Amino acid sequence: MTMTLHTKASGMALLHQIQGNELEPLSRPQLKMPLERALSEVYVDSSKPAMFNYPEGAAYEFNAATAPAPVYGQTGIAYGSGSEATAFGSNSLGLFPQLNSVSPSPLMLLHPPPPQLSPFLHPHGQQVPYYLENEPSAYAVRDSGPPAFYRSNSDNRRQSGRERLSSSSEKGSMAMESVKETRYCAVCNDYASGYHYGVWSCEGCKAFFKRSIQGHNDYMCPATNQCTIDKNRRKSCQACRLRKCYEVGMMKGGIRKDRRGGRMLKHKRQRDDLEGRNDMGPSGDMRATNLWPSPLVIKHTKKNSPALSLTADQMVSALLDAEPPLIYSEYDPSRPFSEASMMGLLTNLADRELVHMINWAKRVPGFGDLNLHDQVHLLECAWLEILMIGLIWRSMEHPGKLLFAPNLLLDRNQGKCVEGMVEIFDMLLATSARFRMMDLQGEEFVCLKSIILLNSGVYTFLSSTLKSLEEKDHIHRVLDKITDTLIHLMAKAGLTLQQQHRRLAQLLLILSHIRHMSNKGMEHLYNMKCKNVVPFYDLLLEMLDAHRLHTPVSRMGVSPEEPSQSQLTTTNSTSSHSLQTYYIPSEAESFPNTI
């Protein structure tokens, strides 16, 4: 039996409107819903309200006299929770629910991509209209229920997050690139590829220096040893290029401290952890550490060093036996002195004395127990001080004169022929007079000379680019041994305790003046080298350049750019020797070749 609805005309009109908007009806599976009342009670007259019980048990009222709020918008259809019409579906006839059909779960929601809906709060049982703003129609199926009124697209959020991340990473990479500093080769001013042999250099200069120190290449400059070395002319002269490498500080052992191998870093971390655990007491508190470490906890100490077991008399005897022989100069009395001739005599004499100094240092008790790096480091720092204290000692018996060699005795007036030499002469003469007044003994002299050697490089400058000493503890113990020997000599001479303290302080204070004279002399020698007044021999040149690496640039009287502009002439003399040749032959490969 078919019932005729009173609102059929209005339902047909609404159906034509939907078809005009080209909206396809939703197809849903038909679910059987048991009705609690007869059909006649469901379809009621439009003049009175109708009641219908849904499965949720909620009662809904529809007033046909009042124009119902449209569920369908102009541009789309939306079904959402809280809407009575959308909770159970609508048929093509309008607002009345379709018989024996409910909305399945999950619910289906048709909405624009940005669902800009305008919900209105309402009391329970009242229909809620949804006004879709003027947005293009789109459809999306939502699997979760119940659907929310507004839910942003998670794909859009993820995409925007990826865009923000990529943009931030691009900004970060640009910032890192801006922070990176462009470095140039210290030899030829080309772009540097890294930190090689102690300086920033390019691949070409790195490979050239590597070939030069591995092979025995005797480069000869075809001109005057003044060739310009830059990016375009670095291959024109190998001799000047190698000279430039040494001037800027390239050396065979020059490596960055952070470039050590992973195994070395692992062992260092393990050693540091072990030391940290040893420093912790039983209760977890740090043990109190003394300013001067105890001999029982000193690390890297040569416990079996013969020097530490020597008596004071044995130490003095060993130091006296290690003294180098006297060296005669090439002075010709028939030739008058000039700036070039005097500097030539002094540099030649100093170059030959350096060879004997190396042999003397190896015979100083405790010095031979150090590793090769520390031995070279101490000699490079103290070589001019050792030469000066020897000159002062020889000149004690010649007031007003300096005995450079048995056949070369110079006074202050003769030193005036060399620019800047008079000031150094005066300081040397004053120190010699001080030694003469104190009646310095030969045993005290050899002790002071050894103290200068061992104490020169213990406290390096912070601005030094070279590695500091590795066995400082052993050096300190040998210094203490020699100082005790010096005190023993004073006590043996019959001085009282107060006189011993006073004399020891006076002698050690003189060492600071010798250090000052050494710095003045180093500055003078470097100026002579830059002016090309006299040719410098290989070993002397190597020691001069090495001393400048241990000294801050501000200490020297020249700017750091001068080494690259200096005019240097080297003499390949048979009497000149390199430190690598005469120091320790078995480990000579650890030193770079000189020019």
Curated annotation (Swiss-Prot):
Q: Pfam families recorded for this chain?
A: ESR1_C, Hormone_recep, Oest_recep, zf-C4
Q: Where is the lipid attached (S-palmitoyl cysteine)?
A: 447
Compositional bias ranges of the Basic and acidic residues kind: 154-165
**Is Metal-binding there in the keyword field?**
yes
Identify the stretch(es) annotated as Modulating(transactivation AF-1). Answer: 1-184
Q: Which residues carry this modification: Phosphoserine?
A: 103, 105, 118, 167
Spans annotated as Required for interaction with NCOA1: 35-47
The highest taxon in the source lineage is Eukaryota
**Where in this protein does the record put region Transactivation AF-2?**
311-595
Endoplasmic reticulum among the record's keywords? no
Q: Where would you say this protein principally sits, based on its record?
A: nucleus
Using the UniProt annotation, give all residue ranges assigned to the region (Hinge).
251-310
Region entry Interaction with DDX5, spans: 35-174
Record localization: Nucleus; Cytoplasm; Golgi apparatus; Cell membrane
Keywords tagged on the record: Activator, Cell membrane, Cytoplasm, DNA-binding, Glycoprotein, Golgi apparatus, Lipid-binding, Lipoprotein, Membrane, Metal-binding, Methylation, Nucleus, Palmitate, Phosphoprotein, Receptor, Steroid-binding, Transcription, Transcription regulation, Ubl conjugation, Zinc, Zinc-finger
User: A GO biological process this protein is involved in?
Assistant: positive regulation of DNA-binding transcription factor activity
Q: Which one of the record's GO molecular function terms can you name?
A: zinc ion binding
Annotated spans, Mediates interaction with DNTTIP2: 185-310
Give the start-end ranges of region Disordered.
143-174, 260-285, 554-578
| Comp. bias (Basic residues) | 260-269
Zinc finger, NR C4-type: residue spans? 185-205, 221-245
Residue positions of the PTM Asymmetric dimethylarginine? Answer: 260
- Spell out the subunit comment: Binds DNA as a homodimer. Can form a heterodimer with ESR2. Interacts with coactivator NCOA5. Interacts with PELP1, the interaction is enhanced by 17-beta-estradiol; the interaction increases ESR1 transcriptional activity. Interacts with NCOA7; the interaction is ligand-inducible. Interacts with AKAP13, CUEDC2, HEXIM1, KDM5A, MAP1S, SMARD1, and UBE1C. Interacts with MUC1; the interaction is stimulated by 7 beta-estradiol (E2) and enhances ESR1-mediated transcription. Interacts with DNTTIP2, and UIMC1. Interacts with KMT2D/MLL2. Interacts with ATAD2; the interaction is enhanced by estradiol.
Instruction: State what protein this is by name.
Output: Estrogen receptor
Report the source organism.
Mesocricetus auratus (Golden hamster)
